Amino acid sequence: MKAKFKILIPEPKSKFIRVKCRQCNNEQVIFSNATFPVRCLSCGAQIVIPKGGKAKIEGDTVRILG
């Protein structure tokens, strides 16, 4: 019989993501479970669309932080 291992310190499934805007190539840090639409700081294009749980990322993912 195999022993089940418990996760001693649970980690969150949400992360911070560095995203590049497709229109102006501006890089911006966003939250993966964003609840509000995120717009690019330089051109104003919408980068993230909230979908209830995980947000839909419209830009290009550069790097996952943390």
Swiss-Prot record:
Keywords: Metal-binding, Ribonucleoprotein, Ribosomal protein, Zinc, Zinc-finger. The keyword Repeat does not apply. GO terms for molecular function: structural constituent of ribosome; zinc ion binding. GO terms for cellular component: ribonucleoprotein complex; ribosome. A zinc finger (C4-type) spans 21-43. Belongs to the eukaryotic ribosomal protein eS27 family. Part of the 30S ribosomal subunit. This is Small ribosomal subunit protein eS27.
